[in-house]
């Protein structure tokens, strides 16, 4: 046992074995080296350790307990520290690990810079309640991951290699940055916890991001995220999936204030919205977009050149505005509420169905609407069937098949409708065919209450000539 209560002025080097090295209150050590042949069972610091505590290649320190101030710890490649604890009121300015920290590392004090270098191996790193780490960088293997406890603070986490799980119950002030080609298995942001921002760089991977807390600033994915969950208590501000980035499944059950932006060549396989979502601005590819019961999306913009495979707005769900200048490849099914749906000149829709529970305020077609519009008959709980307040056609429309209620159909100048069928349950309040508008065929088995024709109607079959 070595007890130091004063100052050791020069450097201290251990080439042998020390069972207990105690730097006590009032003690000062300057540059301590545990050499390649050295072993220290327990090093306890309650004083000041200036310079660097170096554990060289082949050296072993079984336990480091710090209660006061260590300027720098350098665990070199091939060096082993079994257990490292920075206790309450303990301060480590810099910890550089290029070797192995075998057991869990717990920080209960303050660490300014913690750097796990490319040859470094760490298991579980815990930043305990009321503890602080300014910058945490992992270039090696941090297999068990990082836990930031309640009221604990980490300013920045930077990962360039392999990191297991980041569990945040406290505050990560600035960013979690997952750098190019790096991997994080899971990020879990708990209820009441805060992360400033998240950056997943090109070719970087986050397998699961699970948010029940707050991400204050931008969340930018430039790489790959397999599963992204914004849970009931979760709040995200702006979520951007950048060019050539991929999100496999994105589920929103919480608050996504700034909405989702999917940039050119970005890919989101599935968006499952179960809560309030400000917007979806798509310039890339979205596979399935599903707005669930009682959920609301304020605005969806599918830009020119962008693609959405399937859109489903479920019963009880609401989309305030949907504007399409790109392509919706397969079915577009509305079982809920859509305030305004516009298919612009560059846009393509295929098979637009407003079901028996659906309501669309204004539906405007200026582009291609292949497969036409189907407004379905009543279903249980929907005595009037599907309802569309107004259809405005400014281009070519293959069909309108109505078994519900349409307040007005306006086929504008130079526009055309191939087949308009009003089924036995169908009600059309007003049909307008403007100058040089063309309707090839009208088949009415229901009720068309009023209409004006200033264009061309080539065929009209009225199965209910006395319908009111």
Q: PLM ranges: what are they?
A:
Residues 1-468:
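Extracellular beta-strand-rich, repetitive "passenger/adhesive" scaffolds
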């Amino acid at each position: 046992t070595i007890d130091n209560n004063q100052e050791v002025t020069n450097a201290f080097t251990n080439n042998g074995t020390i069972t207990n090295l105690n730097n006590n209150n009032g003690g000062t050590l300057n540059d301590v080296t545990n050499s390649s042949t050295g072993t220290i069972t327990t090093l306890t610091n309650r004083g000041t350790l200036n310079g660097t505590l170096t554990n060289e290649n082949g050296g072993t320190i079984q336990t480091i307990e710090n209660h006061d101030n260590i300027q720098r710890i350098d665990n070199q490649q091939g060096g082993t520290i079994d257990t490292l604890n920075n206790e309450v009121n303990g301060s480590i300015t810099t910890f550089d690990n290029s070797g192995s920290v075998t057991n869990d590392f717990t920080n209960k004090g303050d660490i300014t810079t913690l750097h796990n270098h490319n040859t470094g191996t760490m298991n579980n790193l815990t930043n305990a309640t009321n503890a602080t780490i300014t910058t945490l960088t992992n270039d090696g293997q941090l297999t068990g991951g990082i836990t930031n406890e309640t009221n604990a603070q980490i300013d920045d986490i930077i990962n360039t290699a392999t990191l297991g799980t980041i569990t945040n119950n406290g505050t990560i002030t600035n960013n979690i940055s997952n750098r190019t080609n790096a991997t994080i298995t899971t990020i879990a942001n708990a209820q009441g916890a805060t992360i400033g921002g998240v950056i997943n760089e090109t070719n970087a991977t986050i397998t699961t991001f699970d948010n029940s807390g707050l991400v204050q600033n931008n969340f930018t994915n430039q790489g790959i995220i397999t599963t992204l969950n914004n849970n009931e208590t979760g709040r995200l501000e702006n979520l951007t999936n950048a060019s050539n980035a991929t999100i496999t499944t994105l589920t929103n059950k919480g608050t996504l204030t700034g909405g989702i932006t999917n940039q050119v060549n970005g890919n989101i396989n599935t968006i499952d919205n179960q809560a309030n979502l400000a917007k979806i601005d798509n310039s890339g590819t979205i596979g399935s977009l599903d707005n669930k019961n009682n959920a609301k999306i304020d605005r969806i913009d599918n830009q020119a050149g962008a693609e959405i495979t399937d859109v489903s707005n479920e019963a009880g769900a609401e989309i305030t505005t949907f504007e399409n200048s790109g392509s919706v490849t397969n079915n577009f099914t509305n079982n809920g509420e859509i305030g305004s749906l516009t298919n612009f000149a560059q846009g393509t829709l295929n098979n637009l169905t407003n079901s028996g529970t659906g309501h669309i305020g204004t539906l405007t077609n200026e582009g291609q609407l292949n497969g036409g519009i189907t407004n379905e008959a009543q279903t249980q709980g929907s005595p009037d069937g599907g309802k569309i307040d107004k259809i405005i056609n400014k281009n070519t429309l293959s069909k309108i098949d109505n078994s519900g209620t349409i307040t007005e159909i306006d086929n504008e100048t130079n526009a055309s409708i191939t087949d308009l069928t009003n089924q036995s349950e169908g009600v059309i309040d007003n049909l307008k065919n403007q100058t040089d508008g063309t309707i090839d065929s009208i088949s009415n088995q229901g009720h068309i209450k009023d209409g004006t024709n200033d264009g061309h109607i080539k065929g009209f079959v009225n199965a209910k000539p006395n319908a009111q």
